[in-house]
Amino acid sequence: ITGLVGSEMCIRDRCCTKGFRLRMCHQNSLRFFDEVAYDPVFNGLVLDDKEGDRLVEVMGGKSVLFHANHGIIVCGPSVAEAFDDMYYLERCCKVQILAMSSGEDLNIVPDDIAKKFKEDCASDGGKAHWAKLHFDALKRGLTRGPGRIFRE
């Protein structure tokens, strides 16, 4: 994975139930269609290459890993793209869990529509472009005005 990924981010998220799967139940989740791998094994801290190699194998070329008892790992070609995916993925999980708490069935988007939506979002460099704009806007918010906490 070294050389293929410019950035990796991890979040300890609310979707740590056993067997949790990101479902294609709303528009934001569709951007992750066929991009999520699941690892039901937690071996503690990743302190050696063996466990790191195992996680890379589990990911199988996908950009997102739901790692049991750990959290979500997102990889991307840039910090902006990894952050953008993490931002929207966290919101997808929140919406899905809120919908699941209603006790009603989720309304799953068919695979062909989910695939087309994902392709449309990525066309013409769209995903990278919007991720950069999103990340730049976040940085501006942190660098301007009183109480700024971020400097480039």
Walk through the language-model features, giving the residues of each.
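Single conserved hydrophobic/aromatic residue that forms the stacking wall/gate
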Residues: I1-G6, C10-I11
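Glycine-rich flexible loops
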Residues: R12-E152
